[in-house]
A protein has these predicted regions:
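N-terminal beta1-alpha1-beta2 module of alpha/beta enzyme domains
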Residues: 1-72, 176-178, 296, 300-301
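An alpha-helical appendage that flanks or caps ligand/catalytic pockets
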Residues: 7, 132-172, 204-291, 300-307
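Active-site mouth loops of central-metabolism enzymes
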Residues: 9-25, 83-91, 176-186, 239-240, ...
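Short, acidic/polar
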Residues: 21-34, 93-96, 184-196, 250-254, ...
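Conserved, mostly hydrophobic/aromatic
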Residues: 34, 38, 46, 69, ...
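Internal, glycine-rich beta/alpha segment that forms the wall or movable "lid"
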Residues: 86-197
Length: 313
């Protein structure tokens, strides 16, 4: 199983308490350590302000980080979990992604979803249409991404977006395009879009849920005449590991104190626990067909989970 890890960027309050003039260096230090420990990839979220509630604490923007980290790392693949389609025109976004793939030497993962954080939409002046409309917009965006990365003068006219000879040079180094992750677990539409267009899917579920999503994806693949085995099924979840129960309790107490997330939330997560427990659960995911873990490590700034998890690299 491949493993990637998020850098701290503030969205989940992981830069709280870090002085503003030290925040970028903290992000860089985490990226460097992820690379030194032989992780497959680093990841960032695409959000503008903190969760679970908006605060004045910092949140660094997704594609700004992608561009910068493409120049400060050498071998890590670079992903977003996941780009919110609604926040950027898809032709512009494809242009940005193509540039970063070239700038990074062909290391970009292109992960996108329909968007969900309604408070953020409203705060920044974006329309927040129904889920059905957001998913239709996502499908048009996926089509534009594939056209602009593979054709010289692509033309497309949809209900929400259109391009007319949208030149995209330089093309990405990866052919036909950087791997396309269609993210989200919606079983009727999102998994259908994954079956039609995607190279990878990504879900935040327990092992039983992972098996269920996989079975539904296979049904969609059968209907779309898509080879099910072509699609990588991946997991994104919190990972927090400690050597003993007292240390785990202390970590969770600290996290809860500055995120205001109840301690029970952390104890219920499938990959939070002692080393043997977490590694055994990961093995269960692997047996269920998971090929890639994208780990959000909430103690990455101050704890040792990144080091412990790296034993599997």
């Amino acid at each position: 199983m491949k493993i990637g890890a998020f850098v701290p960027q503030g969205w989940r309050m992981d830069l709280n308490g870090v002085a503003q003039d030290k925040q970028w260096q903290t992000i860089l230090d985490a990226a460097n350590k992820i690379e030194e420990l032989n992780y497959e990839s680093l990841w960032v979220y695409d959000h503008f302000h903190t969760v679970p509630k908006p605060t004045q604490d910092p949140t660094y923007e997704c594609w700004t980080l992608m561009s910068a980290l493409s120049q400060t790392t050498n071998k890590l693949r670079l992903g977003q979990m996941c780009t919110c389609n609604s926040y950027r025109n898809p032709a512009y976004l494809t242009k940005v992604a193509s540039n970063i793939d070239v700038m990074s030497g062909g290391r970009l993962e292109y992960a996108i979803g329909a968007g969900w954080y309604d408070h953020e939409y409203k705060a920044y002046g974006y329309d927040y249409p129904t889920a059905g409309i957001r998913l239709k917009m996502l499908e048009e965006s996926l089509i534009i991404y594939k056209l602009m990365t593979t054709e010289e003068n692509p033309v497309f006219e949809g209900e929400f977006y259109k391009i007319d000879g949208a030149i995209n040079q330089p093309k990405p180094l990866q052919k036909p395009y950087p791997p396309l992750w269609v993210c989200g677990g919606g079983e009727k539409v999102t998994l259908k879009l994954l079956a039609k267009y995607g190279d990878y899917g990504n879900w935040d579920v327990d092992v039983e849920g992972f098996i269920n999503k996989s079975n539904i994806l296979q049904d969609h693949c059968d209907k779309e005449n898509r080879e099910y085995s072509e699609i990588g099924r991946t997991l994104h979840t919190n990972v927090l590991i400690a050597e003993d129960k007292n240390k785990l309790d202390a970590k969770i107490e600290k996290l809860s104190s500055y995120t205001n997330i109840p301690k029970e939330y952390y104890y219920e997560r499938p990959l939070i626990g002692l080393e043997d427990e977490v590694f055994e659960t990961l093995n269960q995911y692997k047996e269920a067909g998971c090929t890639y873990l994208i780990a959000y490590i909430p103690d990455i700034v101050w704890g040792d989970t990144l080091d412990i998890l790296s034993k599997l690299n």
